[in-house]
C-alpha cells in the first residue's frame, strides 16, 4: 500500500533520528564484547529511575546496530531503523516482504528490555520462531540479554525457566495456552507466565486478524450420544432447498417452516424448540452447517479417513485442530468417517482478548494498511507504511476477467506455457485445493511440468518454495504457502523478468491478494503479477447485488465465446466492490465474535482474579462461616406468601444442602423449626466442628475444596455459555437483538454459577468429619 499524509509525516520525523543512529556507527566500534555488555547494564540501570530521551534511543539503537554488524554481518539501513522506531510507539509497521523485518525487530526488543520490560516475540509458527531466535537471539545474547524459545510439550520447570528470559520467542497459541494453563493450576508455584509487558507480533495481520476467528481452547472429552450425528445426517441429506434459508457469506443457515415441520416429523417430537428436543435441534443445525456451509477441499480435507481443517489464509492443513462445539463431528458424519467424541471446553480465550492484556503491543507485516480500521478499533494500533530501501521493480497488471472458468483455465495455461518456454519461473496462486488440483490437471494435459503445494503435501513446503525461483520452474500453491520465507531467484532469472505471479481468483481480502503479489519483486528484483479471474468465481457468484445480477446475466448471454477477457471498467469496479463488501462482512464476523467473547472475558477475569487471590493467600478470601450463613439463609428463609410451586423449590434446595451431611438434626425435625433458628443451628454446629481442626489444616482443606468446586462449576458454566451462544441467533427472528439477549442471559448464568459453587461449598462444609477429611 502507498503511504498517506500521516505516514509520510511520521516517517519524515523518524528519518532524521535514523540518520543520526547511522552516524553513530563509530561510537562502539572499538569496544569489545565485555564493554558492550557494560553499556547494556548501564542503560538497564539508568531507566529504573529516569525516563528515556531521544538521545538515549539513538545511542541504544547504535549499540544494537554495532552488535548486529559483528554477529550476523548485517548493517541496518535507515528504513529498518524507521520501522523499529514506529514499533517502539506501539504501532503496526507495514514493511514490504524482503525488506528485513527480522533485523528491524532486534532494535525494538532491545530497547524494551532496556526499559525493564519482558518481551514476547510472536511468530506464525514454531519453525519461524526457532529460526528468528537463532538469528537475532545470538545478537541479543552477545549484548548480555537473555533469550529463550517457548515451545509446546515442555514441563512446568522448563516453562518457568523460559519465562525468566528477557526475550521469549514463540507462537500466539503457545503463549495463549500458557496463560490458560496458568489459570488452571492448584499451586501458585506452578504458574509459569510472569507478566505481560510488551509483545511484538510478526505477520501481525495473520495473527491478529486472520486467526482471530478461532478462539484458543483447552478441552477434554465430553460424554455424548454420537449416534445422533449419523441419524441427523440422514435427515439433512433428504432436505430440499425450500426447507431452509441461508446466508453463506455470514456462515449462517436456519430451518424455515417447511424444514421445521420435516425435522419434527423425522425426530418424532411435537416441537423442535422444546426443552426435550434441544439435542436433536442442536445436532440438526450442526449437520446443516456441515452440509451447506462447509466445503470439502476448501474448508477441510479428508486424509486417511480423518477430517483435517484447512487454514483459509495459508491453505495448510491443521493436524490436531478440530472445529469446536460439535461442528467437527457433524462434518465427520457427513463424510462417512468415524465420529470422534466432542471435546468439552475447560478454558478458552480469543486471540484478541489475550493480546489486549499486554501493557504494550506492536506488530510488523507486509500487508496491514487495508485493515487499519480494525487494528485501530480492536487493538488501538495505527498502521504506518514504511518506505522500501530499493524501488519496487514489479510490473502489476490489470486483472484479466473471463466469462467462464473454462475460458480462464485455457488462458492461464497459455500464459504459463510461454513463460515456461522462455525459462521464467512462475508461481500460480489458488484459493482452494479443488482449484489447485483443477489447474494442475490443465497443466498436466498441456505437458507443462510443475510442482504442487497444498494442504495435502504441505510437509514439503520449505523444499517446494526453495525451488520456486529456479529457471523454468512452475509452482502451483494455495493461498500464502511459504509466507515468512524468501523465494530466491537463480542469477540468470533476473534478465527473464524475475518471478511471475499469476493469481487465479481474487481472495476474500485485498490483503491476501497483495501478499501473493508480494512474493515477486523483492529487494528491487524484477517481477510480474496478474490476476486471471472469471465471472463464475466464488467472489462474483456469491456477490448479492441486483444490478450485478442483471449485468452478469446479460454478459453471459451475449458472451462472444472467443476466449478473450471482458475487461470493462464496470466489471473491474464490481470485483472491487464485491471484495470490499466481503471484507466488511468478515470484519463484522470478527467484531461479532469479540462482542460475544467480551461477555465471557469479563466473567473470566473475575474468576481468574479470585483464583489468583486464593493461590496467593493459601486460604479463603472470606470466612467459610459467612458463605455458609448466606447459603443457609438463601435456602431456608423465604417470604411467607410465596406460591406452592416455589415452596417446593425451597424444600428441594434444603434437602440438597443437608442431605448426606454430618449435621445432627434430621430433616423432618428441621421442617418443624423456625427457619432463622435452623440457620443459627447450622452455623454454630459448623463452627464447633471446624474448631476441632488445626487452623492451618482447615484453611488448606477449605481452600482446596473451594478451588475444586469453582473449577468444576466454571467448566460447566463455559459449556452452558456455549449452548446459549449456539441457540441465541434464533432470537434474531423473534425481533430481539441476539447480542443483548446473550449479555442478559449470560449474566444470569454467571450469577447461577457463583451461587452454585457457593452452595456446594456450603454442603461440603457440612460433610467435614473429625479426621479432617471431606467425605463424598
UniProtKB/Swiss-Prot annotation:
Record key words, sorted: ATP-binding, Cell membrane, Cytoplasm, Membrane, Nucleotide-binding, Protein transport, Translocase, Translocation, Transport
Gene3D superfamilies: Helical scaffold and wing domains of SecA, P-loop containing nucleotide triphosphate hydrolases, SecA, preprotein cross-linking domain
MF annotations from Gene Ontology: ATP binding; protein-exporting ATPase activity
Localization in the cell: Cell membrane; Cytoplasm
HAMAP family according to UniProt: SecA
Function: Part of the Sec protein translocase complex. Interacts with the SecYEG preprotein conducting channel. Has a central role in coupling the hydrolysis of ATP to the transfer of proteins into and across the cell membrane, serving as an ATP-driven molecular motor driving the stepwise translocation of polypeptide chains across the membrane.
Protein name, UniProt field: Protein translocase subunit SecA 2
